[in-house]
């Protein structure tokens, strides 16, 4: 089932998916912005400073405030060298309970460039997380095989973004009126945007490296996939 208004707003949802009216109202406001050709609310649509859980198509204009300060937020899935048969949840919980936050775990910057993220290797607040997982059931053998996941190993899923670096980009480019495409300012924003996406991905990797190293399983860490869900896509 979809909710449509003025041919520019679509909400993807069904009868089991309750969406706050405030979020729908915010989505309508976004759809009315100059240059917006389509605004789509996804099943996780909810209100924020701007609506969260949306995809917005624009023409000749960029709205950095719709992306917000968590540039590059996404998910990274990593395969550890911890065998499932040797995994003991109580051991991990006890060890992790000895620290209050990942910033307490010191680690060298694993990249050659200086990090613009001052607290590289931290998850952040909100709905961000790091979670150890195991494969119990495979529903798509072809895709699973293409990822070359070893079912005998523990996986680590990290949800995080560019941390304080994204805040600084937002402070500099958060024009509520938008930025015209093709301008020098648009080019400067996209340069910062792309760098934030790169370091958000690197931050997720560093979170995984920190956790596995702290727990004694740092060697053999492999990135299975890394997907960003908060960014500007050029078409």
Role assignments for model-derived ranges:
Residues 2-25, 34-40, 47-54, 61-64, ...:
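Domain-length cofactor-binding catalytic modules of enzymes
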Residues 78:
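Iron-sulfur (Fe-S) cluster-binding segments and ferredoxin-like electron-carrier domains
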Residues 100-109:
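Long, basic N-terminal domains or extensions that often function
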């Amino acid at each position: 089932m979809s909710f449509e208004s003025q041919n520019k707003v679509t909400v993807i949802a069904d009868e089991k998916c309750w969406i706050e009216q405030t979020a729908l109202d915010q989505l309508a406001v976004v759809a009315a912005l100059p240059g917006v050709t389509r605004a789509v609310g996804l099943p996780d649509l909810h209100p924020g400073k701007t609506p969260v859980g949306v995809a917005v198509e624009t023409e000749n204009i960029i709205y950095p405030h719709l992306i917000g300060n968590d540039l590059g937020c996404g998910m990274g899935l990593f395969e550890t060298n911890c065998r499932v048969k040797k995994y003991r949840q109580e051991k991990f919980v006890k060890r992790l309970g000895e620290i209050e936050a990942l910033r307490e775990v010191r680690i060298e910057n694993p990249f050659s460039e200086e990090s613009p993220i001052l607290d590289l290797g931290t998850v952040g607040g909100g709905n961000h997380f790091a979670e150890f997982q195991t494969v119990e059931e495979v529903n798509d053998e072809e895709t699973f095989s293409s990822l070359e996941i070893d079912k005998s190993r523990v996986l680590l899923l990290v949800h995080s973004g560019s941390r304080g670096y994204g805040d600084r980009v937002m402070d500099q480019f958060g024009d509520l009126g938008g930025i015209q495409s093709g301008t020098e300012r648009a080019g400067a924003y996209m340069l910062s945007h792309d760098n934030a996406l790169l370091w958000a991905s690197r931050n997720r990797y560093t979170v995984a490296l920190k956790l596995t190293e702290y727990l004694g399983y740092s060697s053999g860490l492999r990135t299975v996939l890394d997907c960003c869900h908060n960014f500007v896509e050029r078409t």
